[in-house]
Swiss-Prot record:
Expressed in a subset of sensory neurons that includes nociceptors. Expressed in the subclass of non-peptidergic sensory neurons that are IB4(+) and VR1(-). One of its GO terms (molecular function) is G protein-coupled receptor activity. The lineage of its organism: Eukaryota, Metazoa, Chordata, Craniata, Vertebrata. Residues 40-45, 102-123, 194-208, 266-304 are cytoplasmic. Orphan receptor. May be a receptor for RFamide-family neuropeptides such as NPFF and NPAF, which are analgesic in vivo. May regulate nociceptor function and/or development, including the sensation or modulation of pain. Its main location: membrane. It comes from Mus musculus (Mouse). This is Mas-related G-protein coupled receptor member A5. GO terms for cellular component: plasma membrane. InterPro entries: GPCR_Rhodpsn, GPCR_Rhodpsn_7TM, MRGPCRA, MRGPCRFAMILY. It is found in: Cell membrane.
Length: 304
């Protein structure tokens, strides 16, 4: 008989410590990004997405910390029903974050491939409406999935309605992944292989690094929880190792996004003694780096 997941808790204590550290750092970084974009900086189409992505990452990391506490409670209270309920809540910000990243990549791709059409047919509040829809849709998907698959039970159910709900959830995640990959590849092809060389901006580099970070660190979480978790009947030692690996990589991914923003905003920057507000603002400027640096140098030239 396979052991419950928590009985492998005596193994690999170092990854658990790493996960806690990355989650705390990620929560702090995403909270700073959310505060600056929400209350200190002028928002544009892309900053609205990044603000909501930071919020989704923060909520996801917070949910993971609470989930870890609930996992400890199951040791003393095996019949704890809150774990299944909280699993639904934890899934919402993850799907919302993936949706935000797909929307950012798609909108950036459209702005590069069809710049005139994008400027003429992009209403002012499109990003806000899209973000609202992105939050509502994962919430509905997760609630319906838990309703058809026993709302307070995360065990796999062979009911036809549950199977259909699981299939729709996986299809939705696969759709987001395909959109993310295709839009990113199209953007890279236009930037490096298209006719007429385009200047790289900090915004392009930031989005590409964020997408790359998700593909390397965030995708295993999707594979485990939405593909393998319901297929296997129980946990074994290999499952626990893979489980811990997905949590470490996911924590790194959510922690890396704010680091990418601030690193790219300050990298090769001419201004000294920058504030976090100035660094984040430079990331959101959709202007070539050379032109940006020339403007900054002209500002620093002393007037006669």
């Amino acid at each position: 008989m396979d052991k419950p997941l928590w009985k492998y808790g005596h193994l690999d204590s170092d990854p658990k410590l790493m996960i806690i550290i990355f989650r705390l750092v990620g929560m702090t970084g995403n909270a700073i990004v959310f505060w600056l974009l929400g209350f200190s900086l002028h928002r544009n189409a892309f900053s609205v997405y990044i603000l909501n992505l930071a919020l989704a990452d923060f909520v996801f990391l917070l949910c993971h910390i609470i989930d870890s506490m609930l996992l400890l409670l199951t040791v003393f209270y095996p019949n704890n029903i809150f774990s299944g309920y909280f699993y639904t809540i934890m899934t919402v910000p993850y799907i919302a974050g993936l949706s935000m990243l797909s929307a950012i990549s798609t909108e950036l791709c459209l702005s590069v491939l069809c710049p005139i059409w994008y400027r003429c047919h992009h209403p002012e509040h499109t990003s806000t409406v899209m973000c609202a829809a992105i939050w509502v849709l994962p919430l509905l998907v997760c609630i319906l999935n838990r309703y058809f698959c026993s709302f307070l039970d995360i065990n796999y159910n062979n009911d036809k309605q549950c199977l259909a709900s699981n299939f729709f959830t996986r299809a939705y995640l696969m759709f987001l992944f395909v959109v993310l990959c295709l839009s990113s590849m199209a953007l890279l092809a236009r930037l490096f292989c298209g006719t007429g060389q385009m200047k790289l901006t900090r915004l392009y580099v930031t989005i590409m690094l964020t997408v790359l970070g998700f593909l390397l660190c965030g995708l295993p979480f999707v594979i485990y929880y939405f593909l393998l978790f319901n297929i296997k009947d129980g946990f074994c030692l290999f499952d626990f190792r893979f489980y811990m690996s997905t949590h470490v990589l996911t924590a790194i991914n959510n922690c890396a996004n704010p680091i990418i923003y601030f690193f790219e905003g300050s990298f090769r920057h001419q201004l000294k003694h920058q504030t976090l507000k100035m660094v984040l603002q430079s990331v959101l400027q959709d202007t070539p780096e050379i032109a940006e640096n020339m403007v900054e140098m002209s500002r620093n030239i002393p007037k006669p």
